[in-house]
From Swiss-Prot:
Phosphotyrosine modifications at: Y246
Primary localization class, coarse: membrane
Disulfide bonds: none
Name the UniProt record assigns to this protein: Probable serine/threonine-protein kinase PBL24
EC class name: transferase
Catalytic residues of the enzyme: D198 (proton acceptor)
Length: 389
């Protein structure tokens, strides 16, 4: 279950859920117009990680214990690879918050923890869950985040209960766009840049307006950014969402996140969980099931969530499937950059007619073109869309 959630339909810990970790964005993957020197987070934190230099508020443990009624079970709203998350209400301000109590096994030292808090406190974007504060008290390590009353995308898409209103098509595209913008910030605008590493539907939180906010980014020590590739000592992502090259070799790049985004977009299109052993054998892995359909564009409508009851523009469905198919390509080099995905989804979410006025890059990582030049978003039929993949 994701962190910082509102009431969830399923609070039990999920199998195969790895720690939600972030890693540095390799220098070789910086945008062509931004080959700036980047440093490790540890270097960024040097001489700055003292509490007085951290923008996030420092809380006493007793304050957070009071806010959560001593971390009672009824206040528990989520569990993940890093610990438990409780809903709380600050006694002094009345602010409702989400308190993440980190697992005390393998605790970092005080300095390492403060370096990470300093790093997290520098990340600000409308599509990231805000870090309000932290607690470093004895062996206790806690993070305080804004509370997200609607829970996670998973709650509204994959754990729909009887009588619950399913997400409509426009909301799904809007959520996809918000999540993509959050990733774009981490990849291309944060300094130093960050790879999410465990992007999934349970880590996409929703506020009262159904705006997407990413959670659980950057909660682990980061490796060297000088290497040509970031090779993790162990793969820690969630099965089904991990890019194949990361799962096989531990090699991590921004394109690993793009693959994971493609999985979530496919979940948004289909309403199906990426791994579900209750489905027929050939459908248990969502990506494996969808790949043959990607090759037969006339079958694209088969991917649509039955709960949508056909209430979606066919052209928009075709475009969304095209984006997902590109993100889910086996070879990382031919996947798009997340900024190209943002361009495409922005166009989809605002389209009112002819797309000829759109400027920017199209979804083609090998030979960037304008949307007008490549034309893939202008296609009317599934076959036309797929011919441009």
């Amino acid at each position: 279950m994701s962190c910082f959630l509102g009431p969830s339909t399923n609070n039990k810990s999920r199998e195969n859920e790895g720690s939600s970790m972030a890693a540095p964005y390799e220098q070789q993957n910086l945008p062509r117009n931004d080959r700036r020197q980047i440093t490790t987070w540890e270097a960024v934190g040097t001489n700055k990680e003292s509490p007085k230099n951290i923008k996030a508020k420092s809380f006493k443990f007793r304050e957070l214990a009071t806010a959560t009624n001593s971390f009672r079970q009824e206040f528990l709203i989520g569990e993940g690879g890093f610990g438990r998350v409780y809903k709380g209400k600050m006694e002094k301000t009345g602010q409702v918050v989400a308190v993440k109590q980190l697992d005390r096994n393998g605790l970092q030292g005080n300095r390492e923890f403060l370096v990470e808090i300093f790093r997290l406190s520098l990340l600000h974007h409308p599509n990231l869950a805000n870090l309000i504060g932290y607690c470093l008290d004895g062996d206790q390590r806690l993070l305080v985040h804004e509370f997200m009353p609607l829970g996670s995308l998973e709650d509204h898409l994959l754990d729909v209960v009887v009588g619950q209103q399913p997400l409509d098509w426009n909301s799904r595209i809007r959520i996809a766009l918000g999540a993509a913008k959050g990733l774009e910030y981490l990849h291309e605008k944060a300094n130093p840049p960050v790879i999410y590493r465990d992007f999934k539907s349970s880590n996409i939180l929703l506020n009262v307006d159904f705006d997407a906010k990413l959670s659980d980014f950057g909660l682990a020590k980061l490796g060297s950014v000088g290497d040509t590739q970031n090779v993790s000592s162990r793969v820690v992502g969630t099965y089904g969402y991990c890019a194949p090259e990361y799962h096989k070799t531990g090699q991590l790049t921004v394109k690993s996140d793009v693959y994971s985004f493609g999985v979530v977009l496919l979940e948004l299109i289909t309403g199906k969980r990426v791994i579900d052993t209750t489905r027929p054998c050939h459908e248990q892995n969502l990506v494996t099931w969808a790949q043959p359909i990607f090759r037969e564009p006339n079958r694209f409508p088969e991917l649509a969530d039955p709960l949508l009851q056909g209430e979606f523009p066919e052209k928009s469905l075709n475009q969304a499937v095209a984006i997902a198919a590109m993100c889910l390509q086996e070879e990382p080099i031919v996947r798009p950059l997340i900024s190209d995905v943002v361009t495409a989804l922005s166009f989809m979410s605002t389209e009112t007619g002819s797309p000829s006025g759109l400027t920017g890059t199209a979804l083609n990582p090998l030979s960037p073109k304008t949307v007008e030049d490549q034309g893939w978003l202008q296609c009317e039929s599934p076959r036309d869309v797929y011919s441009l993949l």
